[in-house]
Amino acid sequence: MKENLPVSLQKLIHKVEETFAEDPAMVELFINCFSNTLDTTVKKMEDGTTHVITGDIPAMWLRDSVAQVRPYLVAAAEDQEISDLLAGLSRRQFFFVNHDPYANAFNQEENGNCWDHDETEMSDWLWERKYEIDSLCYPVQFAYLLWKNTGRTDHFDDNFVKGLHTILNVWKTEQYHEEKSPYSFQCKGCYCTDTLSREGKGALVKSGVGLTWSGFRPSDDACIYGLSLIHISEPTRLQLIS
C-alpha cells in the first residue's frame, strides 16, 4: 500500500517505522491510516483542483477535508506533487465557499446528489446545507498553513480573495441573524438535532452583541444556543479571535 505513495511520504513512513520499531502494531495502524486517505478519498480533478470525500460518504465537507489532508503538509515543502495536490484542494474549497458559504458539504460534480431533501436553498453542487462556522474557518486556516509550510502563494488568487470577503460578509450578517440572515434549514421526520426550530431559523437570539450566529456544531448537530461560543471548537475560536 505504501509503495503507491509519493517518495516524500514513504520517507516519512520509514522514519516512523524506525522511531517506533518496538511497537509494530502502532506502526501498521499509522501506515494504513496515513495511506488510506490518498488511496480512497482524494481525487485530482480535470480543472486542477482536488476533491476529498469523507470516505464513508461520497461528498466533501469543507472542515473534514482539511483535517483529512493536514498531516501531508509535513511533506509539502519538499514534494511538489503533494504541494500541488493541497493547493488544488484549497482552490476547490474557496470555489465552494463562493458558491454557497452556508453549505457544509459538496458533491464532486454538479449532479444534484444530496443527503436528504431538506427545506433550504439547495443547488446541484450541494450535498448538505447545514451552516457551521467551522466550515468557513478551516479553509482559511488551511490556506495559511499551506503558505506557511511551502511558501507558495498561487492559491491566494482572486477566488481566494473573493472567498474571504464572502466569509466576512456572512459573519457580519449573522451578527444580526434575526433581522438580516437569508438562511433557514428544516429537515422533516428527523431527530431534533438534525433540524432548526422556528421554521428553520433556530432558537431566538439577540442581535448586535458582537457574536456571530451558527446553525450547527462541528458534529453537524443543531445548536441549541446559536450565539454560544462553547459549541465552537478551540481551533475555530482561536481563528475567529485572530
Task: Label each region the model flagged.
Residues 55, 60, 64-65, 69, ...:
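Surface-exposed loop/turn and secondary-structure junction residues enriched for glycine/proline
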Residues 230-242:
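Residue-level detector of conserved catalytic or cofactor/ligand-binding positions
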Residues 18-42, 99-111, 188-207:
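An acidic intrinsically disordered interaction segment
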Residues 45-53, 112-130, 192-227:
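Acidic/His metal-coordination segments adjacent to aromatic residues that form catalytic metal sites
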Residues 2, 16, 42, 54, ...:
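Residues at structural and domain junctions
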Residues 1-63:
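Low-complexity, Ser/Thr/Pro/Gly-enriched N-terminal "stalk/linker" regions
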Residues 58-86, 90-191:
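Aromatic-rich carbohydrate-recognition surfaces in CAZymes
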